[in-house]
Design a protein with these regions (language model features):
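Acidic, metal/ion-coordinating pockets
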Residues: 1-117
Length: 117
């Protein structure tokens, strides 16, 4: 749910988000399946942050807007893991912003030794 720093707006997630008539569009084909299970856990590939401080030496820094956390709720996603190679693309600030966005939506998260329940 985001873009890398050099990606054009054209054909980007941001463009799809801006043009979507319904925010539920992104998970519409799996929402019913996710809603019927006990818990849906997904990988959150990049942080949800407005930070512009990219990690040095990283070829592709991925991030999404913190508002995208709401899309997870609309998709009946209850938990995310973001213990992956892009978690620190925007430093610790990016991780903190992600945690805040997830907590505001009531989404459980896990990364490294941190679990938000």
């Amino acid at each position: 749910m985001g873009n890398h720093q050099e990606q054009d707006y054209s054909a980007s997630f941001r463009q799809a988000y801006d043009q979507a008539e319904d925010e539920g569009y992104f998970f519409e084909n799996v929402r019913d399946i996710f809603a019927a299970d006990d818990m849906t856990i997904v990988n959150l590939e990049g942080p949800l942050t407005t930070s512009e401080q990219m990690r040095e030496g990283q070829t592709y820094c991925i991030k999404g807007d913190p508002a995208y956390a709401h899309l997870l709720t609309l998709g009946s996603i209850e938990a995310v893991s973001f213990a992956n190679n892009h978690r620190l693309d925007y430093g610790e600030q990016g991780s903190r912003d992600t945690v805040v966005a997830l907590e505001q939506e009531g989404i459980i998260y896990a990364y490294d030794k941190n679990v938000g329940i």
